[in-house]
Amino acid sequence: MNGLPRVGLGVDVHPIEPGRPCWLVGLLFPSADGCAGHSDGDVAAHALCDAVLSAAGLGDIGDVFGVGDPRWEGVSGATMLRHVVELITQHGYRVGNASVQVVGNRPKIGWRRYEAQAVLSRLLNAPVSVSATTTDGLGLTGRGEGLAAIATALVVSLRDPLGSQ
């Protein structure tokens, strides 16, 4: 570990499952259908998990929360993010900041952006930016068949002055 900040990228995509609760960016959107998945289907939380794990050099979400492990079945994205923060802390890192962009038509998240940023920032103990975009009708997100998220995270060493709080 050289003490320099490290950057990671995470991507997650899930199909929409009619009738399933919609958890996205750490929030429940009661009027929208949610995503299928082993856990709660929160693509934004999952992409953030991948980005943080990647930045810390600890693999990816599949390594930590494998679909074959019943302990993680139905677990919330919030629980997953808390676990990832514990893991990177054990390995001498903390999150410096993160950003996540949701790709899809629905639910619209703009009106809850600041609430989402507050929830995710609290979970990661760091500033988190939230944004959204569409694919102008192209692909599975454009046809409303699924949602995707792309995230970046910067982690810093707890053992280096740059990582001091």
From Swiss-Prot:
GO terms for biological process: isopentenyl diphosphate biosynthetic process, methylerythritol 4-phosphate pathway; terpenoid biosynthetic process. The keyword Nucleus does not apply. It catalyses: 4-CDP-2-C-methyl-D-erythritol 2-phosphate = 2-C-methyl-D-erythritol 2,4-cyclic diphosphate + CMP. Transmembrane segments: none annotated. A divalent metal cation binds at residues 12, 14, 46. Its EC number is 4.6.1.12. One of its GO terms (molecular function) is metal ion binding. Pathway: Isoprenoid biosynthesis; isopentenyl diphosphate biosynthesis via DXP pathway; isopentenyl diphosphate from 1-deoxy-D-xylulose 5-phosphate: step 4/6. Its cofactor is a divalent metal cation. Keywords: Isoprene biosynthesis, Lyase, Metal-binding. 4-CDP-2-C-methyl-D-erythritol 2-phosphate binds at residues 12-14, 38-39, 60-62, 133-136, 143. Belongs to the IspF family. HAMAP family: IspF. This is 2-C-methyl-D-erythritol 2,4-cyclodiphosphate synthase. It comes from Mycobacterium marinum (strain ATCC BAA-535 / M). The gene is ispF.
